[in-house]
């Protein structure tokens, strides 16, 4: 991944938390569904209604402009600004998510159906493997709720996820030389996927997901590095063996399957002991802060009892 460079954010572009919280009271699910239903058009941010989730943070939110303009989404290009600049032609509707594999009831879910799940707002830390972080108010629902619908078989041990392949709409997927193999694939153990912290997000900052942030639906696993949060999901499969994930296949020495946030296991090319929080600039720019084990979500530690987290990075 490219080296980290903190973005410049004009003060006029920063969404104050107080404004966001007051505006959220006027948001409605109907408007969100209406925008999702605009088939064949560019994604239009629309308000969503969500109940407050059980997981909250008493930390400053990352400015909305930074969340939507400083992204890794290689399907639109490898630069941090590429996803915002190059995703205008991407069509997040119509959209279906196929859930298959080792399940009793394989199904396809339209995005309109998924948007009708009881939505929660979850404010999570997001830690990128590159050494920077954000605090983002996501809107979504537990992945376990979707898995319950399809009834995984006893032989299912892992969950595999795939991003859509549309080179005509995603310029990072076209061209002779590709940075990665497509489709983008990620995976979790089934117990990780079922953990209450793991969600499928359909919005952020009170509105539907922008294209550059993974519209119309993406994975959020807050105790893992950000690249595990696969975007624009079109297929979820229950499988018996560990999925062959994209970054691990690209460079297994640098990107492991688990990729839990761990300040004690460095990336081969940089330390993971500290991070730079986007949007928190001091006199000398963005300041370093200590990285927390599991990104501060200690209740997942029991998932890895007896597992060597250095060998299984």
Curated annotation (Swiss-Prot):
Family of the protein in this entry: Belongs to the MsrP family.
Cofactor(s) required, per the database record: Mo-molybdopterin
Transmembrane segments: none
InterPro entries linked to this entry: MsrP, OxRdtase_Mopterin-bd_dom, OxRdtase_Mopterin-bd_sf, TAT_signal
Organism: Agrobacterium fabrum (strain C58 / ATCC 33970) (Agrobacterium tumefaciens (strain C58))
GO molecular function terms attached to this record: metal ion binding; molybdopterin cofactor binding; oxidoreductase activity, acting on a sulfur group of donors, quinone or similar compound as acceptor
PTM remark: Predicted to be exported by the Tat system. The position of the signal peptide cleavage has not been experimentally proven.
Entry keyword set: Metal-binding, Molybdenum, Oxidoreductase, Periplasm, Signal
Name of protein: Protein-methionine-sulfoxide reductase catalytic subunit MsrP
Cofactor binding summary note: Binds 1 Mo-molybdopterin (Mo-MPT) cofactor per subunit.
Top-level taxon in the UniProt lineage: Bacteria
Keyword Metal-binding applies: yes
């Amino acid at each position: 991944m490219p080296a980290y460079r903190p973005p410049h954010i004009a003060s006029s572009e920063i969404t104050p938390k107080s404004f966001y919280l007051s505006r959220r009271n006027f948001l409605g699910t109907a408007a969100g569904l209406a925008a999702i239903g605009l088939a064949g058009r560019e994604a239009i941010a629309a308000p969503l209604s969500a109940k407050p989730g059980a997981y909250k943070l008493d930390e400053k939110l990352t400015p909305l402009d930074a969340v939507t303009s400083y992204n890794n989404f290689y399907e639109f290009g490898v630069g941090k600004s590429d996803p915002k600049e190059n995703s205008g032609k991407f069509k997040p509707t119509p959209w279906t998510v196929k859930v298959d594999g080792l399940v009793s009831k394989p199904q396809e879910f339209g995005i309109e159906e998924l948007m009708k799940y009881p939505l929660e707002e979850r404010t999570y830390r997001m830690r990128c493997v590159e050494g920077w972080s954000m605090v983002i108010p996501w809107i979504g629902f537990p992945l376990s709720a979707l898995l319950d619908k399809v009834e995984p078989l006893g032989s299912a041990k892992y969950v595999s996820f795939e991003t859509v392949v549309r080179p005509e709409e995603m310029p990072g997927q076209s061209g002779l030389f590709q940075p990665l193999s497509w489709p983008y694939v990620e995976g979790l153990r089934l117990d990780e996927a079922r953990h209450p912290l793991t969600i499928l997000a359909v919005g952020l900052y009170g509105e539907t997901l922008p294209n550059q942030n993974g519209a119309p639906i993406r994975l959020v696993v807050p105790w893992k590095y950000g690249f595990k949060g696969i975007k624009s999901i079109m297929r979820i499969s229950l499988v018996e063996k560990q999925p062959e994930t994209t970054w691990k296949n690209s460079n297994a020495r640098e990107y492991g399957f688990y990729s839990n946030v761990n300040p004690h296991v460095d990336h081969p090319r940089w330390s993971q002991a500290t991070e730079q929080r986007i949007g928190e600039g001091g006199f000398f720019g963005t300041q370093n802060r200590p990285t927390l084990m599991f990104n501060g979500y200690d209740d997942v530690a029991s998932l890895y009892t007896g597992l060597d987290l250095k060998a299984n990075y």
